[in-house]
A protein has these predicted regions:
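Short, amphipathic alpha-helical "recognition" segments used to contact nucleic acids or chromatin
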Residues: 1-6
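Helix-turn-helix DNA-binding elements, focusing on the entry/boundary residues of the two helices
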Residues: 10
Length: 66
């Protein structure tokens, strides 16, 4: 039986984009502070951990790829 997660961590998003987790964190910081950024995804926080909705990440990847 396979369980598909509804949320992605920084590491998962980085893997999908071919970037590093620190790049994802940096983009989140820039977005939060109104600076120029490329990663246009809104994180949800579970406790203090930023998580990204899987469907939104996949839509972003498709938009960037095509």
């Amino acid at each position: 039986m396979s369980v598909e997660l509804a949320f992605y961590s920084d590491k998962d998003v980085a893997r999908r984009l071919g970037m590093s987790p620190s790049w994802v964190r940096g983009q989140r910081h820039k977005r939060k502070h109104g600076q120029k950024h490329l990663l246009d995804l809104e994180p949800r926080y579970i406790g203090t951990c930023a998580r990204y909705v899987r469907a939104e990440v996949e839509a972003f990847v498709a938009k960037v790829a095509g």
